[in-house]
Amino acid sequence: MHTPTLTSTPTTATSVVDDTAPAASGKKVYIRTFGCQMNEYDSDKMSDVMAAAEGYTPTDDPEQADLILFNTCSVREKAQEKVFSDLGRVKHLKARGVLIGVGGCVASQEGAAIIERAPYVDVVFGPQTLHRLPQMLAQRARQGRPQVDISFPEIEKFDHLPPAKVDGAAAFVSIMEGCSKYCSYCVVPYTRGEEFSRPFDEVLTEVAGLADQGVKEVTLLGQNVNAYRGRMGDTSDIADFATLLEYVHEIPGIERIRYTTSHPNEFTPALIEAYARLPKLVNHLHLPVQHGSDRILSGMKRGYTVLEYKSTIRKLRAIRPDISLSTDFIVGFPGETDDDHARTMKLIDDIGFDASFSFIFSPRPGTPAAALHDDTSYEVKLARLQQLQATIEDNVRRISERRVGTVQRVLVEGPSRRDPNELMGRTECNRIVNFDGGPNAARLVGRMIDIRITLAYPHSLRGEPVLRD
């Protein structure tokens, strides 16, 4: 069995934090994140890079910032246009010398065109070049002109990122970049490049380092996370995703493992079997299906049928009967008929999804689907979306109500968003639970505790701590 080298993790983390990190410069960075959890991870890394290189500290107020970064998403046109709207709102801050940068997938897709549209932007960088941000800003100062770097140096950025700084008991770990599926509607392969997996030992070292700092839950990230194929040490051996999960499962201190986003075509028998052997693997899965019609799935170039998707779910439920399932849907793909939509609604009834991210089809420039003839009115698409979302909401309500009276294991994350005097945490099945932590509330943050569910709301639960003997 392969034995990864993990012993250097505590020393490395300590030396960076205690010895080499620059003193706070007084400068502040504001980062606005759009889109997926991969972007959230990248935003954290931007903050880490600027803290390590220049001593920047984060701020939630752009008016107080010396550097403003927009980490963008190009999956839908609305998200892309919002970036330029937000850029316009901070333009006035240039008068006092604030630096502005645009990163992420819009940056990768548009490149120098962003400077043409918003000439007050100082740097434009892609998902694979965020580690070069300090150098780009320095070059901007030396040359007196905006800098653009949207190249794809594969996985180079991970070799130049400082060790992760922990904020809470849960953390993201990116295990791969890019996508090689080339679905007809999707820009990700063009903005993040082809699939490239981080080395196996490197991922395990990062997770072990997080565990040493008190992290109890890790979410493994990738555009197609279950397509992971990482090189094992100095050998020619390759670890698949199921193997990686096994090794992460054995890291002391890690109590929960999540991952996103997975692809149905990469749901191997070994991955399904992992749900029987790995209790730390949470009882929740996000598995995008996108549509319930085989004809539309073919047009999307998803590579599977509805029956194949349902077969995967059936095998999973044979192992974990109460597994919580969420998914993605695209409504109004070119050529979608009433019958196609009805098939999607039937799939929702058949599976019983806990939640979904659903949107009207947004043609993205440069993708094959953008050239398809689309004769369905926006009003029809909107009505279909509303029907789909209402059905999912009914499912969510019923499933939440069934949890009333049960005891759920909850990782306490911090103050409740509903009431800062209370606490909130997350169940294995990814439900938020709000509760009164009592006089010892501060000591509960970061801990796993049992909560008896007393009330069900549309998108959260309420409960009370259960005292153990």
Curated annotation (Swiss-Prot):
Residues 27-142 form the MTTase N-terminal domain. It catalyses: N(6)-dimethylallyladenosine(37) in tRNA + (sulfur carrier)-SH + AH2 + 2 S-adenosyl-L-methionine = 2-methylsulfanyl-N(6)-dimethylallyladenosine(37) in tRNA + (sulfur carrier)-H + 5'-deoxyadenosine + L-methionine + A + S-adenosyl-L-homocysteine + 2 H(+). GO terms for cellular component: cytosol. Its main location: cytoplasm. Pfam families: Radical_SAM, TRAM, UPF0004. [4Fe-4S] cluster 2 binds at residues 179, 183, 186. Its EC number is 2.8.4.3. Keywords: 4Fe-4S, Cytoplasm, Iron, Iron-sulfur, Metal-binding, S-adenosyl-L-methionine, Transferase, tRNA processing. CDD domains: Radical_SAM. Catalyzes the methylthiolation of N6-(dimethylallyl)adenosine (i(6)A), leading to the formation of 2-methylthio-N6-(dimethylallyl)adenosine (ms(2)i(6)A) at position 37 in tRNAs that read codons beginning with uridine. This is tRNA-2-methylthio-N(6)-dimethylallyladenosine synthase.
